[in-house]
A protein has these predicted regions:
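A generic structural signal for short beta-strands and their flanking turns/coil linkers
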Residues: 3, 12-14, 66, 71-75, ...
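A short mixed-secondary-structure module that forms the rim of ligand-binding clefts
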Residues: 19-45
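Hydrophobic beta-strand-centered segment that forms part of the acyl-chain substrate-binding groove
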Residues: 47-90
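Hydrophobic residues in beta-strands and at strand termini
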Residues: 18-20, 79, 125
Length: 128
């Protein structure tokens, strides 16, 4: 079923919310494991790249039938503090720059109002 993460606009940034379930702990009691945090940043980051690309082309996601797909070329994650299990997580994306097919993003994941992880992503528009 995947993460079923939904990303939305929040002004000039993007936002998603996710509440991890106990079976997603990765064996770390009461805390979200790093792999899930990286997956959430990755999933929200590539969706955000598509949204930023669409907005840069003077369109909104709602006006596009199938937005361009983006894939991760690079994802750097800094884990700042433990992330509690069961709390709603907020993932935010901010555009750093666009250069052709490449989009650089800054990402942040927070729980209970505190940032617990930051990410830097380079996403590339997928071309078949």
């Amino acid at each position: 079923d995947g993460l079923q993460l939904k990303s939305y606009w929040d002004g000039d940034e993007t936002i998603a919310r996710f509440t991890p379930h106990p079976e997603q702990s990765g064996g770390v009691p009461n805390h979200v494991y790093g792999g899930l945090i990286a997956s959430l940043l990755d999933c929200h980051g590539t969706a955000s790249a598509a949204a930023f690309a669409c907005r840069a082309a003077n369109g909104e996601m709602s006006s596009v039938t199938l937005p361009d797909r983006f894939v991760t070329a690079s994802l750097k994650v800094d884990y700042l503090r433990p992330t509690p299990m069961g709390a709603e997580l907020t993932i935010k994306g901010k555009l750093r720059r666009i250069d052709g097919r490449k989009i650089w993003l800054d990402l942040a994941l927070s729980a209970q109002g505190e940032i617990s992880a930051r990410g830097e992503m380079l996403a590339i528009r997928y071309v078949e």
